[in-house]
Amino acid sequence: MDWQSVSAFAKLFFAVQFLSIAALAQMPALSPLPGTGSLSQPTNSTQFIFVLAGDNRPAHSSDPQSAVPGNIFCAVQRMNPPAAVVLWTGDTISGKDPQHPKRMHDQYKEFLGIATRAGVPVFNAPGNHEMDDSTETPSKVMKDLYRKYMAGTYGAFSYGNTRFIALDSENEPSGAAKSVTTAEGQAKVQAPGAITKTQLKLLKDDLEANKSMAHVIIFMHHPVKAYEKKDGLDEASKKTLEDLFASYKNVSYVISGHEHMYFNSQGPKDLFTPPPARADPAQPPTYLVSGGGGAPLKSNTPGSFFHYLVFTVNGNQITPSLIKVPEINNCTQ
């Protein structure tokens, strides 16, 4: 018997097994929302545009969607050069009603009918209105309805030189979560956003597997760096994510919703300063809140206006633009 050949075969076998396990350990593939199209191959892998917005849910469960999300998706459809994809930071519906699945279906159907106006694939990171019940408690029924009518609750996809990762922040927080105080001064013990250990493990494996990508874009609902602490992730998730993202220099932007406003925690606290361009991978990622997609705006804050963000990728640089959106319907579709 040729033991040298057996040894070489064994090494090859275990190497293949290891690579297969590593591939499986990455985040699951994230699908575009139904009816918004499939992801195509880029004509230029280092030069393209993507759009981000979120938080469009109506003020009340009986209200229709406002004109704002339709205006955003129509603006995307008119872009020249065209956008490759749209990222959404959740709260697509009023939701929070697991007792009435037909009502949830109808709300998703209404939103998806609007999202198709973009003409490009739309990817969503679900929020508390898709995933929780009326007591702000994560609901298995709501999560199952989301998977049935929308997509997976977390996952990733690659486009050109960029990896896009959606996280599901609607999970029970760790026991370390403390009481927080609302802006109105009322103490409450309410579960903030949290990331499960399963997601964190897959996220780390995915970042490790995609170190060669020029950029990684993280999008989710609850902010890592919120305008108000009560709106963010629980401290355990927040610290874990910040430490993890700091270890991977290609993590360019971490963008969340939930707060109905625009907020750049590292930038000036004014109305219209767009996010900074990303060119130096030695710098930490930029943390943003973009929740101006049509839901009732946060009151008495400088960034409370309807908007979306346009990111222009050009090799190792990304340049964002901040676009205000009118409340009156200007979509001709």
Task: Label each PLM-derived region with a short phrase.
Residues 180, 224-236:
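Active-site His/acidic residue clusters
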Residues 321-332:
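Short, solvent-exposed aromatic-acidic interface loops
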Residues 55, 90-91, 127-128, 221, ...:
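Active-site glycine-centered loops adjacent to acidic/histidine catalytic or metal-binding residues
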Residues 26-102, 227:
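N-terminal active-site segment of His-dependent metallophosphoesterases
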Residues 28-37, 49, 97-211, 215, ...:
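Extended active-site neighborhood of metal-dependent phosphoesterases/phosphodiesterases
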Residues 88-89, 93, 210-228:
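Short acidic, glycine-rich surface-loop motifs adjacent to enzyme active sites
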